[in-house]
């Protein structure tokens, strides 16, 4: 008997199986009318051009086919390297790769830059040295001391920068030349290596000297690793991860992708030297000779990438400003925030976990009662049977396999009319809150610091927004009491308070600035309640006479239009007829013609350029703006309208972080930035500094840029994050 889901599916399809067998059976008794002697002769196939295929596979990044063709010909592909890294699974490269995990896009990006510096195509021309003695180390110390710019990278024992230990260091000062200094390889038969202490004592003066300029790929990680060993990295001049992000935010930014895209060069992946899956070993167990090829090329490729990407940025003043004045300095601020971490109340989270567990059990009982039978709430298959077969609810959409979908979008739509989906959504929300935060956060406390250390990624969102992971601070819900309880567990240490500084209606203010709409500018300039003012304009009444319901409608319209909401979306959001929603939108644009003009011009510019820009000149690429698919193209046009607002808000909060950190340092204050979430900065402030920091935050954040409308910041103080609002 075939058991489980496979058996169940077979039994349900018994009547159809004979037809299925007929469909998949290849007929060999067909009358072809003539005998086919040879497929090759019939199709007139020409011999494949193996050399041309080799070049094509290299250009397109078809790695498996490329390796097979190389093996067949006994050669390497043009530009293929003999060894380096995937910037993503090991140490310093890990967060670089994860941070650049955006899908490749189809927008009309600039043509690849042709590097002015010759790149050795033949692996034999590349000179990689493994530094195994003091004499070799001394030679390389002389070389990096004399170089104008040095590519630098670390190899480590862990993806977590707070616990990673150094295994080796790679350096490159010239095209085709690099070295690897192993200090921590441990395996049976490993050769003698220079001691970690002796290497760091020699490197420390150079690493900590701001006059010696360094370039790397995601140097934020390497800075953490060196701090684990008591070294504060200085002289960070360039970062190829950030260069790529500034140029083409919609592309991948890991080193494999960058080397392939810009250098036509294939790098060795981490799996090639360390294995993958359950068999993967730590880098400290990788044989030194393999590690040397991998890591030395990593530094060398970084140097090549910088020499390829930097001239493109240097040629455009606005991009150079984004890179030099925002991305490079904010990377340093983020590293310090990550290092500082945040204190959490583990006992409070444990209590909340227990409470959530009880609520989930109660909800599960209610769900089973509403369904008329018990079932596994975590099983999409069983849930689909309950919703669509037993209860007969309408199928909103289907999965790729053809089954009715039970995702959040579907349940949200069904919840408008049916009680069971509403209960399921509530159960899912609480279950995620419990597993992701109440249960997981205490396990993420670093035993050495007693704090939780999130990781901020700069190169993920095409808008310039930051993202965070382990834990993800951006997704903690704030609209529910349970979500707010999670924020209560982010606490201040004794003698300090949590201070939150949040930009008020920042995207609406940016819309007013960009659209130059007179009525919208006036509402902000006069300090009016902008939603009440909008309601007055739409309904043709004085703002003082606007009802709470009318203000709610106006608020939905204000924020909805920023995100390109259609009449259909507005109708669904407000629970009104589509014709009524269309009338509201028409009235809005009649009262705010500058907003409509801005939207129309932005769509046109996006189609012409393939990107839109922030107030500061950051380019926001739109991958699907020329898609043949109407829905995808429409989504890209909606994104084009919102991206300048989101992107400018991202630039403003980054500039604020830079300004606040400099002010704290210059003033010798003990207050510390500890989190950045959406449009909010969160600090740990000693009691004696509260008024000073409150005044400084307000002044710096409202004055970080001069827009056509004033910037406003709401500042709160409390013993925990929630009470600071």
Which residues make up each language-model segment?
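C-terminal structured "cap/appendage" subdomains that terminate the fold
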Residues: 12, 40-46, 663-715
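Conserved "right-hand" nucleotidyltransferase catalytic core of DNA-directed polymerases
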Residues: 13-189, 208, 217, 245, ...
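Short, contiguous acidic/charged loop-to-helix segments that flank catalytic cores in large enzymes
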Residues: 44, 187, 191, 246-247, ...
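Short, basic/hydrophobic alpha-helical segments
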Residues: 195-211
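A short alpha->loop->secondary-structure connector
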Residues: 227-237, 251-257, 517-521
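Conserved beta-strand -> loop -> alpha-helix junction used to position metal-binding or nucleic-acid-contacting
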Residues: 232-248, 262, 527-531
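Conserved catalytic core of nucleic-acid polymerases
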Residues: 281-284, 332, 336-339, 394, ...
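C-terminal polymerase-core module
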Residues: 358-365, 369-422, 590-638, 642, ...
